[in-house]
């Protein structure tokens, strides 16, 4: 496996490779992984145990700016809450926890408008680090500008410099098959060279669209686009198989490269924990879990949610169950690929039609909002409804999301060929999913598993009404009591074990042919 991004890095692509590696090992594959080193981070005890028997080879890096700036990094970030925040309980508890994962600060511009004065004083010691982030911003802008004219990505020179070392690894290990993840994209060029040198077939995990991605292509110069298109054509011609993570992406490439459509396959991303076992025994195991360090840390993460909810209850009538805050979670950052606008418009509909419910609804999201968005929320009277959280450590996500009444998935209509990674974290959970987007495959999965509902971004009236209905009937939904066995089985099909079996079958078919 040539997987430049791999654990302990917590990018989506790194976690996909990690899940495959550990489960392929259980299917009697001898797995070797070549990956970029992650400075300052180490494998967790759980990761070490899962990867026993898997050979790991690190590629040295002089520096790495992707660890703390990637929007797809799911690692632990030192917690701060922006926007509507009246307590620093979460910050205090997380900062006391011991972890081997490097912590990074989230820059919080213009926070004085949203943070109480006493909270500002408690954060005096952090301002020097904020300044460091600001100083680095011009450098990053220069790098981003350079990447517009650079084909693939700026990892290519480094990976190219390690070609001979990677070749020596392959000569030593004598693999039957090479597998590469296109994260970063420069891995595609590397795998072609290695395959030719050793005569070993290769499988490419494209995951998302490469040159056919409208958002990515818009950021590249015409020259860079031509180079990338030429590389993509050659990779598709030479690869033994190509894997995508969404049906829309698969169809897009099968139409564009019809002569090679038969070598293209769909293997979704997946969740990676035995939710059926934990769901069925959740009540019985509660006392045991509370003695578990991981569970205690998760409770620390949710402490802010609970304390915030308690404060909100005091502002409404205590006797009514409808006075309880209705908590939604968007396990991501608002950006062009996951726009905030549909939620703003839906909340305005709720404000107009259901004033009591509006006063109780809260949406927790990862990261800070842009200044322009913060001002818009303030002008519309929505600042109390949107609450920022720090990124949640990946291994604590399953327990953390159970604190909420609903889970939000957002997808820009022009990116309907992909499925957001957070969707797979939501799927085996208990709270219902509200998907806002146009990906038909997601809608089909939600329908077949009875896990939620999908709306297009303009359906703000319908979104508002569904949220109101969920608030009225919350507590009646449960994977244990309200979901039939056949629907549970449909959810299990998207587990990492099942998806790895699909990948294993594909590998065997390539080797036999």
Predicted regions and their residues:
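Nucleotide-sugar-dependent
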Residues: 12, 338, 393-400, 407-425, ...
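Carbohydrate-associated surface elements
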Residues: 248, 270
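A charged, aromatic-enriched C-terminal amphipathic alpha-helix characteristic of glycosyltransferases
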Residues: 458-462, 475-510
């Amino acid at each position: 496996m040539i997987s430049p991004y791999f654990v302990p890095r917590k990018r989506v692509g790194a976690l996909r490779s990690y899940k495959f590696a550990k489960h392929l090992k259980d299917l009697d594959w001898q797995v070797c992984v070549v990956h970029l080193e992650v400075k300052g981070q180490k494998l967790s005890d759980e990761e070490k145990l899962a990867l026993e028997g898997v050979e790991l080879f690190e590629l040295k890096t002089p520096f790495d700016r992707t660890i703390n700036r990637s929007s797809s990094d799911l690692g632990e970030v030192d917690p701060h809450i922006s926007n509507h925040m009246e307590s620093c309980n979460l910050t205090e508890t997380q900062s006391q926890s011991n972890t081997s994962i490097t912590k990074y600060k989230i820059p919080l511009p213009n926070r004085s408008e949203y943070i109480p004065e006493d909270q500002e004083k408690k954060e005096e010691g952090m301002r020097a680090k904020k300044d460091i982030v600001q100083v680095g911003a011009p450098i990053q802008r220069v790098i981003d500008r350079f990447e517009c004219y650079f084909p693939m990505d700026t990892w290519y020179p480094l990976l190219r410099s390690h070609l001979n070392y990677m070749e020596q690894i392959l000569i030593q290990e004598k693999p039957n098959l090479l597998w590469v993840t296109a994260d970063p994209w420069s891995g595609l060029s590397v795998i072609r060279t290695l395959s030719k040198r050793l005569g070993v077939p290769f499988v490419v995990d494209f995951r998302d669209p490469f040159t056919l991605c409208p958002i990515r292509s818009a950021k590249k110069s015409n020259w860079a686009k031509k180079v990338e298109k030429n590389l993509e054509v050659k990779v598709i011609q030479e690869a033994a198989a190509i894997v995508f993570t969404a049906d829309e992406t698969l169809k897009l490439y099968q139409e564009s490269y019809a002569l090679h459509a038969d070598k293209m396959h769909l293997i979704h991303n997946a969740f990676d924990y035995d939710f059926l076992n934990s769901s069925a025994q959740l009540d019985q195991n509660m006392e045991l879990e509370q003695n578990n360090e991981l569970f205690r840390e998760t409770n620390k993460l949710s402490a802010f949610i609970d304390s915030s909810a308690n404060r909100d209850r005091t502002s409404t009538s205590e006797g009514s169950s409808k006075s309880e805050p209705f908590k939604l979670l968007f396990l991501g950052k608002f950006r062009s690929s996951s726009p905030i606008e549909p939620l703003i418009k839906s909340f305005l509909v709720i404000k107009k039609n259901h004033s009591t419910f509006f006063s109780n609804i809260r949406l927790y999201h990862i990261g800070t909002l842009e200044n322009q968005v913060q001002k818009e929320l303030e002008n519309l009277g929505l600042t109390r409804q949107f609450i920022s959280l720090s990124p949640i450590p990946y291994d604590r996500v399953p327990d953390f999301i159970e604190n909420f009444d609903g889970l939000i998935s957002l997808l820009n209509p022009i990116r309907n060929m992909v499925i957001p990674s957070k969707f797979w974290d939501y799927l085996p959970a208990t709270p219902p999913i509200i998907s806002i987007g146009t990906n038909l495959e997601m809608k089909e999965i939600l329908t077949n598993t009875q896990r939620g509902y999908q709306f297009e971004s303009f359906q703000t009236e319908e979104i508002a009404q569904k949220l109101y209905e969920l608030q009225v009937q919350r507590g009646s939904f449960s994977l244990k009591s309200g979901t039939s066995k056949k629907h549970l089985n449909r959810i299990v099909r998207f587990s990492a074990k099942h998806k790895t079996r699909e990948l294993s079958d594909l590998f065997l078919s390539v080797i036999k042919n």
